[in-house]
């Protein structure tokens, strides 16, 4: 699953309301990795890495932020596996165009869980308002032609499940350990997956996005933790 908000943070947000302030979410905490949790967005790379590593610190088990190589291996393992409710077989073309199995702005997928709508603020190109997550329901996400979208709780859509992995395509962009550099040599970190405010024609699960500075936060960016058995 994508990393879900820590219990302590979820409990302090009245009715799961999201104001768009990264101060609510951009902090330390132990992520939840299970279905039905509000995904941890508005978090920068530094906190995402530290929080992913905080899940398990034992002699025989540890955790961390997913690497770019691990992401690529995960996608390769998915080829030939069944795509959730669609019952079709995932091919390499599904990695280039993830429309059929990811939660993106310009498609509709079936879900059983909670959903929050994100509305673009036309007066400020950097502002989106994320409305409250409702109660658990069944339905399909909306197909938008502009920068609006429906964000789902973790594991809400079986359509978005391949090889027992949820939301590798869409829902939230996910920080990785992979490094990139901008034209001035400043260190960035790569994001993968595409998100609920992304267009599937441009931002599929195999797409590498430069991400941004390690202190960048956004309504469409979260992370995923991986486990290491020693």
Stretches found by the model and what they are:
Residues 1-4, 68, 174, 220-224:
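Residue-level signal for functionally critical sites in structured catalytic/ligand-binding pockets
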Residues 3-6, 70, 79, 177-182, ...:
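Acidic glycine-/aspartate-rich tracts in secreted/extracellular proteins
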Residues 39-46, 50, 62, 66, ...:
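Disulfide-stabilized, aromatic/cysteine-rich ligand-recognition loop
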Residues 1-168:
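Short aromatic-cysteine micro-motif
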Residues 170-178:
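Active-site-proximal beta-strands of protease catalytic cores
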């Amino acid at each position: 699953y994508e990393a879900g908000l820590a219990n302590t943070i979820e409990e302090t947000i009245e009715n799961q309301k999201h104001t768009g302030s990264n101060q609510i979410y951009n902090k330390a905490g132990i992520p939840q990795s299970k279905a039905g949790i509000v995904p941890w967005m508005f978090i920068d790379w530094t906190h995402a890495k530290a929080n992913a590593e905080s899940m398990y610190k034992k002699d025989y088990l540890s955790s961390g932020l997913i690497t770019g190589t691990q992401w690529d291996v995960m996608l390769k393992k998915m080829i030939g596996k069944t795509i959730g409710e669609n019952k079709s077989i995932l091919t390499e073309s599904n990695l280039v165009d993830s429309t059929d199995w990811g939660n993106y702005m310009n498609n509709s997928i079936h879900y059983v869980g909670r959903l929050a709508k994100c509305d673009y603020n036309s007066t400020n190109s950097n502002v989106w308002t994320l409305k409250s997550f409702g109660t658990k329901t069944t339905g399909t996400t909306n197909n938008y032609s502009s920068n609006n979208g429906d964000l789902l709780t973790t594991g809400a859509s079986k359509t978005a499940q391949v090889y027992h992995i949820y939301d590798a395509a869409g829902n939230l962009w996910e920080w990785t350990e992979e490094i990139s550099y901008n034209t001035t040599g400043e260190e960035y970190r790569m994001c993968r997956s595409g998100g609920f405010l992304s267009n599937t024609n441009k931002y599929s699960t195999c797409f590498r996005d430069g991400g941004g500075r390690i202190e960048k936060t956004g309504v469409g960016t979260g992370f995923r933790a991986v486990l290491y058995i020693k």
